[in-house]
């Protein structure tokens, strides 16, 4: 029994682990099923690890027992590990599922960013194409122009043509004998410094040659690019006739040729309100365009004029005291109160031109352009104004301060200081007419004086000849009479008494008596100089005869 029990014990011991092993295997299978249900991806990954333990129990009994004990311990730990792993494995699986939409969102954001970049590149390319340029009407000093040229480019299309500048200079510098090349050159250098005519003098020579060939100007003095020139008055009419003959469908008018881009700065200058400027700017403008007033040499004249205008109420002093500070124009309606004398006109044009910044509303611009430059169609002109404002804003010439689109207020981005001829052409025409009248009067006076001088020069020569002719006749006739009359009488005296020397002292006494006859010689003005000596000679001869008779009487008495 002992043996049976001893033999039976190991069997019993062996049977227990087998049962437990089968149970464990069953539990493993159940766990695998659970894994199959929950984690299909994990099964495929760990299938190589799970399959080998199934073949191991079939190899041998003892190995199975040892393995069963080991697996019992490992299975317990593996079960816990699997349970622990299932939780984090489920988490990444759940996390992996939402990663796909995130990737899709990222792809969409990337595509949107790329499209934005493309749009930015296109906009940059457009900005590069439309570069800011300096307009031709901008009034800049040499230093300001150099700075601006570094940042921007000069506008090539809107730059004024040399031919038009030349005709303007000839008209401005015109005098009696035409406009000299030196004066024309100075005018262009002073008014159009951007042309750099000091360095590029060939521009003026070429323009003179072209205009001479076209017949627009005429050379009065000199040859080539020197001398004086005059604008031909009928040249414009002939050019217009030729254009009318050539063109059959469209008729070109000067209003259509004028661009609104060139009109806008002057419109801003006239319409900007209120107009004000400092004393330094007024002085600079007056000294530049009114050299006759000599403000640089006599600044007190300008100061006194400004103070007088403030006292009269024609100007308002906003800042400063006395003649320093900022002055503002006062108006009665649309006309300024200041004006009349040359100094007042100079101050008026200086304040209107040097006012900065120059701003204007679109409504005022519309009104100004429709009144002064109506064109063929008013609606089309307004449309052109809208387009020019947009183009000028893109070029950087204008800036919109308020409003949007074609409404609000615009401002000039560059300084613009027009000359008095451009700002007030009517006054300049009046001044030119007055100057021409004065010149005509002076010319007429000079002609009259020259005619009088010529007549005086022509008349006196015959008088001088008449005066010169009679004296030689009287001289030629009178002297021989003297000699004939005087010669025989002295001959008689020595014949009567040759040896007596007493008569000479007695001859002196009658000479003394002849003194009262001296004033009688001075009195006759009409008598000639030749008659005077003859009369004196006769008087001298008479006393000599009386002396002789007295001597004879004395001799007789002695006898």
Curated annotation (Swiss-Prot):
UniProt xrefs under Pfam families: Linker_histone (PF00538)
Feature: compositional bias, Low complexity: 516-533
Keyword tags: Chromosome, DNA-binding, Nucleus, Repeat
Compositionally biased spans, kind Acidic residues: 429-459
One BP annotation, GO: nucleosome assembly
Subcellular location field: Nucleus; Chromosome
UniProt motif PxVxL motif: location: 256-260
Domain of life: Eukaryota
Spans annotated as Disordered: 1-132, 421-559
Free-text function comment from the UniProt entry: Component of heterochromatin that maintains heterochromatin integrity during G1/S progression and regulates the duration of G1 phase to critically influence cell proliferative capacity.
Name of this chain's protein: Heterochromatin protein 1-binding protein 3
């Amino acid at each position: 029994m002992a043996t049976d029990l001893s033999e039976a014990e190991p069997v019993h011991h062996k049977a227990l682990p087998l049962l437990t092993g089968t149970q464990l295997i069953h539990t493993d299978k159940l766990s695998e099923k659970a894994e199959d249900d929950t984690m299909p991806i994990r099964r495929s990954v760990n299938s190589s690890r799970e399959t080998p333990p199934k073949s191991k129990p079939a190899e041998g009994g003892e190995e199975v027992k040892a393995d069963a004990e080991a697996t019992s311990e490992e299975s317990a730990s593996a079960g816990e590990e699997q349970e622990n792993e299932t939780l984090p494995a489920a988490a990444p699986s759940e996390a992996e599922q939402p990663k796909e939409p995130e990737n899709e969102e990222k792809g969409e954001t990337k595509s949107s960013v790329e499209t934005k970049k493309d749009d930015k590149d296109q906009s940059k390319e457009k900005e590069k194409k439309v570069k800011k340029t300096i307009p031709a009407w901008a009034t800049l000093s040499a230093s300001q122009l150099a700075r601006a040229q570094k940042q921007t480019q000069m506008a090539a299309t809107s730059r004024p043509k040399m031919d038009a500048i030349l005709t303007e200079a000839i008209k401005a510098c015109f005098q009696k004998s035409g406009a000299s090349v030196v004066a024309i050159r100075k005018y262009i250098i002073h008014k159009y410094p951007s042309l750099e005519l000091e360095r590029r003098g060939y521009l003026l020579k070429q323009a003179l040659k072209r205009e001479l060939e076209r017949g627009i100007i005429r050379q009065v003095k000199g040859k080539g690019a020197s001398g004086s020139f005059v604008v031909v008055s009928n040249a414009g009419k002939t050019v217009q006739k030729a254009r009318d003959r050539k063109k059959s469908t469209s008729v070109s008018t000067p209003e259509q040729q004028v661009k609104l881009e060139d009109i806008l700065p002057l419109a801003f200058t006239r319409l900007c309100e209120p107009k004000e400027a400092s004393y330094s700017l007024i002085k600079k403008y007056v000294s530049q365009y009114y050299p006759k007033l000599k403000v640089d040499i006599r600044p007190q004249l300008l100061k006194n004029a400004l103070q007088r205008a403030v006292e009269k109420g024609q100007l308002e002093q906003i800042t400063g005291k006395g003649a320093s500070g900022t002055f503002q124009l006062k108006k009665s309606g649309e006309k300024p109160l200041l004006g009349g004398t040359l100094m007042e006109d100079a101050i008026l044009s200086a304040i209107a031109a040097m006012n900065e910044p120059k701003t204007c509303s679109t409504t005022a611009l519309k009104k100004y352009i429709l009144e002064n430059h109506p064109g063929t169609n008013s609606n089309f002109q307004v449309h052109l104004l809208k387009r020019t404002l947009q183009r000028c804003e893109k070029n950087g010439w204008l800036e919109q301060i308020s409003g949007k689109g074609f409404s609000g207020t615009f401002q000039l981005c560059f300084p613009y200081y027009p000359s008095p001829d451009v700002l007030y052409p009517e006054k300049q025409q009046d001044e030119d007419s007055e100057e021409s009248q004065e010149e005509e009067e002076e010319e007429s006076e000079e002609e009259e004086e020259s005619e009088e001088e010529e007549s005086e020069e022509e008349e006196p020569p015959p008088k001088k000849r008449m005066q010169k002719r009679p004296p030689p006749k009287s001289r030629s006739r009178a002297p021989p009479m003297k000699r004939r009359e005087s010669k025989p009488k002295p001959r008689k005296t020595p014949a009567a008494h040759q040896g007596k020397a007493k008569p000479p002292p007695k001859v002196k006494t009658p000479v003394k008596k002849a003194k009262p006859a001296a004033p009688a010689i001075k009195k006759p003005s009409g008598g000639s100089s030749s008659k005077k000596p003859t009369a004196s000679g006769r008087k001298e001869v008479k006393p000599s005869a009386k002396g002789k008779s007295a001597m004879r009487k004395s001799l007789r008495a002695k006898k």
